[in-house]
Amino acid sequence: AAPIWQDFSFTGLYGENYAHPVNMDDNNQQTTATVEYTAKLKYGDFFGFADRAHNDFENSTYFELSPRLSLSAVTGTKLEAGPIKDILIAGTWEANSSNYPGADFNNYLYGIGFDLAIPYFQYAQLNFYKADNEKGTTDDYQMTAAYGIPVKLGSEDFLIDGFLDWSTGENATHASELNWTTQWKWNVGKHISPDTRLYVGVEHSVWNNKYAIKGLDQNDVSALIKY
């Protein structure tokens, strides 16, 4: 069946404060090209993206594919309570390919998700996962929140959207991670035509214990263009 709606986008990013395990510092330059696809389906939704990144130490391709199955749609019963709009079975496949030794992996996450109704939010999701990580990497648990907030100032349209990932620390070599990434974007495309979405802005990334490495912390602001 055709999607109820779908969206495809391309994003370019450039920042100078990316953290990397080679030097355990966050003063590394990185350029990233991202393609994203999201769709609302009859029985759930789908989100996927791929990053092609180049920094001082490596070239890498990272992607995530995240299908979710709506229990409301499957059962024909609205599963709503308070701010919860729907309950979903959630899954994610994370994969990385890099010329940096030991950086390739495939992780498989599965769990339960919630769609939330929050005033002023275009969308809000909360997912809880068990992560089966690459062999040699400790399995853990993860919480992922995703959100989008449209803002209108005068005749100008802005969008604040992003995600927050928090994962558990399992042992001395696998620290608890927190990755909070938000994009602050202005739609300059509406000045080209009413239906054109061309965003410029910044992406702010706060990533504590990046890659589950204790003390590898990132606080980066990247220039952004998205179409």
Feature names for model-found ranges:
Residues 2-53:
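Short glycine/proline- and aromatic-enriched beta-strand/turn motifs that initiate or cap beta-hairpins
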